[in-house]
Amino acid sequence: MSMPATSTKTTKLATSLIDEYALLGWRAMLTEVNLSPKPGLVDRINCGAHKDMALEDFHRSALAIQGWLPRFIEFGACSAEMAPEAVLNGLRPIGMACEGDMFRATAGVNTHKGSIFSLGLLCAAIGRLLQLNQPVTPTTVCSTAASFCRGLTDRELRTNNSQLTAGQRLYQQLGLTGARGEAEAGYPLVINHALPHYLTLLDQGLDPELALLDTLLLLMATNGDTNVASRGGEGGLRWLQREAQTLLNNGGIRTPADLDYLRQFDRECIERNLSPGGSADLLIITWFLAQI
């Protein structure tokens, strides 16, 4: 399919640099979905609490999305002179086209819609920073992405419309802002919690997969995951947060033997039909930012 026009401005960024960051985005998606065992989520062992998707769907989806990540970076660079609040509207057509390719690759299964939103924002932020010759760090990338999303939660979640979306309903009932709120705030769960936690575990010499699984537990314990709340209500969300925190309090995931606790947690999530997809999206962001 044809690419949406990105901007009338040109970018000075090298294609190799753009492709390098796009490749990291693809690797981040694959790293997350291949990580096993993950409670309630699709992984190499099972399909979690999902009956409509499998591991291969995520692999096809990630490949389809990879081709669009350079477009997000290019738009971020080409729009570097625009007010940050104006950037999001320009990103939407690229995101919608990317989403269309994702659905075609998976025969209609929503595998990575949340990641298109978050990685699209982060890639655009990287493009803007590179174009302006500013440092590309986890903090600058997330703060730039936040500037694109200023006012997003108010605009899209606060409404008096009688026909509420799932996100609007969860916001009104439980105060959950989901992916929009996390992006608008500059991904504080990642920057202040998950990323330093993950990097500290790596510095301590922990196996990277175990470190990532432990970081997933941290996100599950702290994230107001709208995916979980939409399936299990407030009770399901609080149960999942409590169980994840209990595992962390008991030492977390430090050895292969600890994986038995995750397998049991996975079985319980499947029984309750709970899938922490929002936390999985934040784990993708965490791994991605850890590489830059």
Curated annotation (Swiss-Prot):
One family name in Pfam for this protein: CitG
One record GO biological process: prosthetic group biosynthetic process
Key words, A-Z: ATP-binding, Nucleotide-binding, Transferase
The EC number(s) this enzyme carries: 2.4.2.52
GO terms, molecular function: ATP binding; triphosphoribosyl-dephospho-CoA synthase activity
Highest taxon listed in the record's lineage: Bacteria
Catalytic activity, as annotated: 3'-dephospho-CoA + ATP = 2'-(5''-triphospho-alpha-D-ribosyl)-3'-dephospho-CoA + adenine
NCBIfam families given in the database record: citrate_citG, PRK10096.1
Family: Belongs to the CitG/MdcB family.
HAMAP family: CitG
Task performed by this protein: Catalyzes the formation of 2-(5''-triphosphoribosyl)-3'-dephosphocoenzyme-A, the precursor of the prosthetic group of the holo-acyl carrier protein (gamma chain) of citrate lyase, from ATP and dephospho-CoA.
Protein name: 2-(5''-triphosphoribosyl)-3'-dephosphocoenzyme-A synthase
Name of the encoding gene: citG
